[in-house]
Regions:
Chain C
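Bacterial N-terminal signal peptides
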Residues: 8-16
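A mid-sequence, solvent-exposed acidic-amphipathic segment
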Residues: 174-184
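Eukaryote-skewed repeat-based solenoidal scaffolds used as protein-protein interaction platforms
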Residues: 148, 173-174
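Electron-transfer interface patches adjacent to heme c in soluble/periplasmic c-type cytochromes
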Residues: 21-73, 84-146, 153-157, 162-163, ...
Length: 156, 103, 276
């Protein structure tokens, strides 16, 4: 029990360090990518830690981001999600599912003419927000859409 | 043979690139229905895409991208005939790569 | 006694002739009219989408996933099975009518010589046996399931065209019809309870798909990966109403498929698709 707590604290600490480093501009997003997989952020078990891990704490809600996801997922194992960012010079599109065991799903760095657009399919463990985070021009923006997940199904 | 399928075509001024990758994308949280044992995590954690030799997408993934991942992105300034290369690497160090020409 | 049965049988024929309105075609029209009356906004051709036709949110997910289906690899595996010759060097294509193309909509077909319904899966097994191979179990998704997930795509676009045109065929059709309308299982449901009377309604979180259109799109890949054939789906339905299911390929299931496929006559085939 104690051990577990210690590990969570350690994880949170590491994420906080990354967040501080990112916030201070010590790590450029591009460098983070060319380097290692963002373990602290991907293994975070709550949204706040995951957001901190990707340097998105305090991201501003934006209506310039459209999260196109279903109201009710046909099947939680494959939920189509499209994120469109109308924010100029979108450098990153990040997708999180707030109720997943590990909320952070993917971080897409876009460059050399790639539009502010990503379409993919994700797993959702429970009803909750699918959140998109956009990084552009040194700022961080976010928007979310709730997707309901039901169990069962007839498959007809 | 690569396990990545790519469809790339121009739509107006943008190249629309769609791809499907063969991968189980095991989160590590799922139990084997027969044995009750956890299935070890096995997922793509890094994806890159280049168009005409320039990196347009560099992504990190967790295990919650669906099995046999689908990915679509759009690139301005690309043209018909440009080569698209998509590559992935997973948490076990396995790799795959495929290329296609924008139609 | 024998005379009595004979008399009953002839009476049946006479009665059948008088009650001409109870033909398979009038049965189908009744079902189609019932649905069209209840759901005037749904186009006949959209019945191929099943429950998705009633739910734009679900349909748009289907469209997204079908844009690049995650199960293409399984279909490729089925293609390889289809193209790999038997030990005697012959292939499925050589053994089947029209090389196996644009024929699935004719099945199930009533075979007068065998005196029973032959499904597309049975046709595949007939080919296998004729060429010295062991038949597949109709319920084995790894063999019959994977093979048909490709073989049925060779008939994509063909319209379902089931014929019931002999006394034996009518008997098999009626057998399937009885199973469809008869209540059974611990929960006392008929197939018709959900897939005709309550079709389009919600059962908790599920929209119930109508019988019209159910036979044209199997096999399905549930959740994008779990391969399920039509008769394997029967097994699932039977379990849900707490009725001991048959093995896929049983006479009863084949007759039910015969009836259900007739109910989809005129709809275009489209295998193999995503379902929830």
């Amino acid at each position: 029990m104690n051990n577990e707590r210690r590990q969570i604290l350690k994880g949170a600490g590491a994420a906080a360090v990354v967040a501080v480093a990112a916030g201070a501009g010590l790590l450029k997003p591009g460098n983070v990518f060319a380097a290692d997989w963002n373990k602290a952020a991907f293994e975070a078990k709550d949204v706040a830690t995951a957001m901190a891990g990707i340097g998105a704490t305090g991201a501003a809600e934006s209506d310039q981001i459209v999260v196109d996801a279903p109201n009710i997922a046909e099947n939680g194992s494959r939920v189509p999600v499209k994120v469109t960012s109308k924010i100029a010079n979108t450098e990153h599109i990040i997708i999180l599912a707030e109720k997943n065991t590990n909320p952070l799903i993917a971080d897409f760095a876009l460059s050399n003419g790639a539009d502010g657009f990503i379409s993919t399919a994700i797993k959702l463990g429970a009803t909750g927000n699918v959140r998109a985070v956009v990084k552009a021009g040194g700022k961080v923006y976010t928007a979310a859409k709730e997707v309901k997940v039901t169990i069962g199904g007839c498959g007809g | 043979m690569s396990g990545i399928r790519i469809k790339a075509a121009m739509s107006g001024d943008n190249a629309v690139v769609k791809c499907l990758m063969q991968h189980p994308m095991e989160t590590g949280f799922r139990k084997d229905a027969k044995t009750g044992q956890l299935i070890p995590a096995h997922f793509i954690n890094h994806v890159t895409a280049t168009v005409a030799g320039k990196t347009v997408l560099d992504a990190q993934w967790g295990g919650a991208i669906s099995a046999n991942p689908f990915l679509e992105f759009r690139v301005a300034g690309a043209k018909s005939g440009d080569q698209v290369v998509i590559s992935w690497e997973d948490n076990k160090g396995e790799k795959d790569s495929a290329d296609a020409t924008i139609a | 006694m024998k005379k009595f049965i004979l008399a009953l049988a002839s009476l049946g024929i006479v009665f059948g002739a008088i009650a001409a309105h109870a033909s398979p075609e009038s049965d189908r029209m009744k079902v189609v009219n019932f649905l069209e009356h209840k759901y005037p906004d749904i186009k006949f051709d959209d019945y191929v989408y099943g429950a998705l036709a009633f739910d734009p949110d679900a349909k748009s997910q289907y469209d997204s996933i079908m844009d690049f289906p995650p199960f293409l690899d399984v279909i490729d595996q089925g293609k390889k099975m289809w193209e790999t010759p038997f030990k005697n060097g012959k292939t499925y294509a050589e053994c089947m009518p029209n090389g196996g193309k644009m024929i699935a909509g004719n099945y199930p077909m009533y075979d007068e010589k065998l005196g029973k319904v032959v499904t597309f899966e049975d046709l595949i097994n007939q080919c296998r046996v004729k060429n010295g191979e062991q038949p597949y179990s109709n319920g084995d998704m790894k063999t019959m399931g994977v093979l048909t997930s490709y073989a049925r795509t060779l008939s994509d676009g063909m319209k379902m065209n089931i014929k019931v045109d002999s006394p034996g065929a009518v008997k098999a059709f009626d057998n399937g019809k009885n199973l469809f309308y008869k209540r059974h299982g611990q929960l006392n449901f008929a197939c018709a309870s959900c897939h005709l009377e309550a079709a389009g309604n919600r059962l908790r979180s599920e929209i119930l798909s109508p019988v019209v259109g159910q036979a044209v799109h199997f096999p399905v890949f549930r959740g994008g990966s779990n391969l399920v054939t039509l008769q394997e789906r029967f097994v699932g339905c039977f379990k849900m109403i707490r009725q001991v299911p048959d093995q896929p390929g049983s006479t009863r299931f084949n007759d039910l498929e015969y009836f259900m496929s007739y109910m989809s006559n005129g709809l275009p085939l489209h295998a193999s698709v995503f379902r929830k």
